[in-house]
Amino acid sequence: MLDPIAIQLGPLAIRWYALCIVTGLILAVYLTMKEAPRKKIIPDDILDFILVAFPLAILGARLYYVIFRFDYYSQNLGEIFAIWNGGLAIYGGLITGALVLYIFADRKLINTWDFLDIAAPSVMIAQSLGRWGNFFNQEAYGATVDNLDYLPGFIRDQMYIEGSYRQPTFLYESLWNLLGFALILIFRRKWKSLRRGHITAFYLIWYGFGRMVIEGMRTDSLMFFGLRVSQWLSVVFIGLGIMIVIYQNRKKAPYYITEEEN
């Protein structure tokens, strides 16, 4: 089993979980700032947005997680803010981040769809890296399996939990998001019929579908009235993505790749 603590500085423990999230954030900010000028968005506005959105998204992710496990946290109030032990629900962070983005874009007079479109692939790569935090914390795993011989030894050993090998669902989602990120990069450079909002829609559909399937393999999912909350939200994401495509096509929204960029 790998030590979840990456660096110990006296009483201060820096966990791999935090490093994975921060690394994903840094890469996401870099990629978004690099794409921003193409949509006539000032890169410094991206930094301003992150300074506001990131802490609020973390808070939203934690609040979402605590709400659906309130029976436990109501008896352990001191653990509500112990995010270093894990327990961040990505959907809570995404919903909070989207709300902050809408308000921020409106105040900065930035087209919301343009902002979402340049942020979507960056969010996907951040999620891909962030899932490795679950790996180090031994969480977000799946059902028991006989063996994991197809995986590298360090992953196989870390997925030996409570006397059994577990499906590395963190890895499946990480790779799924990485593939989605690569496809978005290809689409936005090569697909000339790509309209404003289509990248956001692709993200919602791609991530929603992958999460819905992978969530069914997990054994530690948040439950609500006997159902997996994330699977219901995945259906909402997919439906919303389809609606965005239909709406933007009927509206004849501007193409993502403009004539000047061809």
From Swiss-Prot:
Native species: Streptococcus pneumoniae (strain Taiwan19F-14)
GO biological process terms on file: lipoprotein biosynthetic process
Main location (coarse class): membrane
EC number in record: 2.5.1.145
Function as written in the Swiss-Prot or TrEMBL entry: Catalyzes the transfer of the diacylglyceryl group from phosphatidylglycerol to the sulfhydryl group of the N-terminal cysteine of a prolipoprotein, the first step in the formation of mature lipoproteins.
Cited InterPro entries: Lgt
Gene name linked to the record: lgt
Entry keyword set: Cell membrane, Membrane, Transferase, Transmembrane, Transmembrane helix
Protein name: Phosphatidylglycerol--prolipoprotein diacylglyceryl transferase
Gene Ontology terms for molecular function: phosphatidylglycerol-prolipoprotein diacylglyceryl transferase activity
